[in-house]
Structures are given as C-alpha cells and as structure tokens.
C-alpha cells in the first residue's frame, strides 16, 4: 500500500471486525436465551405465587416466577432488537457497496459509520447482561461446565474489550460520528424516527411506543447540544459523557426498531393474522419499552 495510508486501511478492516463482534454477541445472546428458556420450562421448583399451575406435577416450572420471566424477556428483547439493527446495517452496507446512485451510496456509508459503534458496544454490553441473566436461570449449576452457560458469559465479556473497547466505541460515536459533523448523521436517523411517528401516530395502540421514543429523541438532541457546548471549554467533557451517551443512543436506536416491529405486529393482528409470532413480538416490544427503554 501507499506510505502513511496504513492506519486508514486498517480502519476499513476494524469497522468490519467491530460489526462482526456485535454479531458474535448477538449469537451469544440468542443461544443463551434459547438454552435458558428450555431449562426454565423443564425445571420444577416451588409453586406460582398466583396459585398452582400444574397440579399433576410435584411443583410448577420455574418459568412461572416473575423474576425468571423478566430475565428471559430481557435476553429475548435484546436479541431481537439487535437482530433488527443488524439486518438494517446489512441492508445499508449492500446499498453502500452496490447501489447505482452515488448519493444513496454516500448516505448509506454515513449511516453505517454512525451505527457501527452502537452495533459493537451496545449489543456486546447487552450480551453481557443477557448471558449473565440466562446463567442465573440455571441456578448454581449454571456456573459449572456441564451446561456450557459459563462459557457464553466468558465469551460475551471479551467482546466488550477487543476490536476497540466499548469506551473507545463511545468516544468514536460522540466525538467523531456525532460532534465531528455537527450532529448531521444523528439528525438523519432522527428523520427516520419522525417518519415512523408520522406513519403510525393515527394508531392509538402505538402511543405506548411512540410517546417515549419521541421524548428520548428530543432528550438526545438536548444532550448532544449540551455536551457540544461543554466540550468547547473542556475536551474531557466528551470522555466523561461518552459511555452514557452511547447507552442512550443505543436505546434510541433499539426503540426505533422495536416500535417498527410493534407497528407491523399490530397491523397483522388487526388484519386477522393469528400467527403467535406477531403476538409475541408485540408483548416483547411492550416489555422493552416498560422495563428496559
């Protein structure tokens, strides 16, 4: 290659690797969830607080217990939200590389750049939470090698470190991808949220998703402006705020995709589609906005 161009070339590889690490963590979240769900259905222990659910069994499955359900739903919500974001990024990458319109290629590349640190850091942070919670479902023997759950937790932890620690991702997001272009890329993503709100706001059942999403979008704009002004006086303000900023940005992005999924599910249910897939999507979206967002 050309002299003094190596670092730029390396970051082409690094950005791809960062998305790959996010995908690895997404897979860990999903497999941990599937294993924990299967175990929770099979493991019998005590009785439901609201009354016996399986009188023909010596105990109810631990799936009846609210905290177990919360841990499983957390993993499910993070896995499915991460999958939606990842598929969106894959579509953007295809457009960046292959779309015949140069303007579309440029805009797609800009959005990929904005979302890459979120894919890497937010999904890997979530995977750490999800795999740890899913191990917890197994109780004490989830910590031994017999089930393999402890390896998922270990694998999830390294993903927060390599290919650029998640703190580095947060600095990249706030310092370069947001403040570096005066928030232009973030505003374009905000325009997508506004389009969804305009399309779905006539559906009263969407209020529980659109209202908090809109509020967080407004707060995100406020946070960005405040941090930008403070950074002009002290560059350490960026470093101090970056990790929390990425966390908020990640929830804004996940919230957008969960609202989109809820909108589709509501439409399908209204059309008479009885596929339990749509009911499950809607219930998970409600959990995400009520407990995680």
Give each language-model segment a name.
Residues 180, 195-293:
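C-terminal amphipathic alpha-helical interaction region
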Residues 1-219:
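Internal glycine-rich alpha/beta core junctions
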């Amino acid at each position: 290659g050309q002299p003094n161009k190596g670092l730029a070339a390396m970051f082409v590889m690094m950005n791809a690797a960062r998305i790959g690490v996010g995908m690895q963590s997404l897979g860990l979240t999903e497999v941990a969830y599937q294993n924990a769900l299967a175990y929770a259905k099979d493991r019998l222990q005590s009785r439901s607080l609201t009354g016996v659910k399986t009188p023909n069994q010596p105990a109810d499955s631990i799936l009846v217990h609210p905290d177990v359900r919360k841990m499983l739903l957390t993993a499910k919500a993070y896995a499915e939200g991460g999958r939606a974001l990842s598929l969106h990024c894959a579509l953007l990458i295809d457009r960046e590389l292959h779309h015949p319109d140069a303007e579309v290629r440029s805009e797609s590349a800009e959005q990929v750049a904005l979302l890459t640190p979120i894919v890497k850091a937010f999904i890997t942070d979530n995977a750490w939470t999800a795999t740890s919670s899913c191990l917890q479902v197994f109780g004490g023997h989830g910590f031994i090698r017999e089930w393999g759950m402890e390896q998922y937790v270990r694998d999830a932890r390294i993903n927060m470190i390599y290919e650029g620690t998640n703190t580095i991702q947060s600095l990249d997001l706030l310092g370069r991808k947001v403040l570096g272009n005066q928030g232009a890329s973030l505003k374009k993503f905000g325009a997508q949220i506004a389009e969804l709100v305009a399309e779905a706001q006539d559906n009263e059942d969407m209020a529980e998703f659109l209202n908090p999403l809109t509020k967080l979008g407004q707060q995100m704009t406020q946070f960005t402006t405040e941090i930008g002004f403070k950074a002009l006086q002290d560059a350490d303000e960026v470093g101090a705020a970056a990790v929390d900023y990425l966390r908020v940005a990640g929830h804004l992005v996940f919230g957008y995709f969960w609202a989109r999924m809820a909108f589709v599910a509501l439409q399908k249910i209204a059309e008479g589609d009885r596929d339990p897939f749509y009911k499950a999507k809607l219930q998970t979206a409600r959990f995400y906005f009520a407990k995680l967002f």
